[in-house]
Amino acid sequence: MMEWEKQLHQLADRLCYLKDIFPGKHEEDIALLQTRLDEIRRKLESCTPDEAQAEMTSLEDLFFFIECKLEDKLTPMDKVRIVRHPHRICLRDILENVYDNYTEIGGQGEHTNDPAMVIARAYITRKRHGKVYHQPVLVMGHEKGHGEEFRNGGSVKPWGNSKALQYMKVAETEGIPIHTYVFTPGSFPIEDTPGAAQQIAKNLYEMAGLTVPMVAVFSEGGSGGAEAISLADRRLMLSHGYYSVISPEGAAAIEGRLKPGQRATPELIERCATQLHITAEDNLQFGYIDRVIQEPSLGARPYHYDFFRTLRQEIIRATDETVLSVRSGMFRGALLRRMSRDDINLDEMYIRWHLSQGARERLVLRRQKKFLRLSRGAYIDRRPFLNKMRNSMRESWGNISARIKYALITKHQRKFAYLMDEMTSEMHLLKRRLTAPFCRIPRDQRPSIEPETVRNLTTLSDWDEESESRKGKWTYISPRAKEDRA
């Protein structure tokens, strides 16, 4: 009986979840589920165990059928409500179910400068030929929690982004990959020094030059707060997530030209959510993300353990692909093709995530080219053709001159200066040896110096003798000294 009550309680939670996601929509399906749930709850009081088991199985099947049916009717705004729901998975769920071990750093819970930013050092365990390998990674992301108010809804303050940047540099020093998870509606609107925009810009500048692999996973990517930790080599996105420069409500306020105190209509918000193209499929088509991770029907929740296994495989695959793409090797192409197969278990493969100096330079160059290409693709250029050609030639010449200046001259300038110092020292030594015979003058040919002059130059003077030689002209007694003597 207690087991059935527990199942009924879980089904009631799923029904409340449907009501929250579809307010005022699909009322017939939701009413059918509510009726069947109440009916079976009454039947359990008088039916036999076999009948109760059959009723619970039929109710489970009905819930599954309705959820799959509603999954096909999801709108962009429905996905926004899924992402914002308290039952949505959070970063702590991912740390507990995707990684084998983790230790939170930079403060825990409320005892940190920003509870909305969680940073942890985690390990992924992989096996090959019976040998176990523990690969360390740095995991960071926005933590919304499940209704925890002190998390501030995942909106990070500037000092939280500063903490993330500090530990990114620590990961670069240790040479371990960085995994970031984006669960934020946007950065917290505060302009205390450093301001939100300034800190995000600093994070972007520093992340563009980090020499370790970076993988970002998007669930809720809102405005610049998402960009503060997501400039990565591989960008993945959950199938029910959204990634937008502004929230649908904010876009509706601008579109409707609302005055203070006014609220946008649900129809306008729905239309703005569709026009913003914020879903995972839209962002994949635009090229802003590299891969979509499929979730269960109506979004992933903490009890969907199969989804966490899928997420683990995708995270490992993205990290391996990033490392192999910049590593030189004869079989690199074959490994990359093998990694793209979905039926392979990456926990039974082992690829070292350590990069050489040359691979790190190629990694940074690839990352910078990727985001420069994305920025050019998002820009509508209406300049005349001749102006485009002239600017393109100027840019090409600037790239060539920069390569000559920095890749050739500046890179070897220190070595050249060291070589010149060594050559100068050797020349001085050679010159001294060549001129040494001419400097050996016989002692009797040196000019003679008067003994009195030698004594004055090589001995200390005596004060009494000096005063007598100067006949007391330098003697001075202050008036105060005369009074003291008297």
Task: List PLM regions with ranges.
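Intrinsically disordered, low-complexity segments enriched in small/flexible residues
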Residues: M1-P136, K144-H146, Y305, R309-A486
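A generic hydrophobic-helix recognition signal that picks specific residues
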Residues: C68-K69, I176, H240
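Cleft-lining beta-strand/loop regions that shape enzyme active-site pockets
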Residues: A120-A208, P213-G225
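Short, flexible active-site loop motifs that bind/organize anionic cofactors or intermediates
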Residues: K69, G154, A273
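Conserved catalytic cores of soluble enzyme domains
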Residues: M1-L11, C16, V182-G333
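Short, motif-level signal for alpha-helix interfacial/capping segments enriched in acidic residues
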Residues: A52-E55, G160-S162, A264-T265
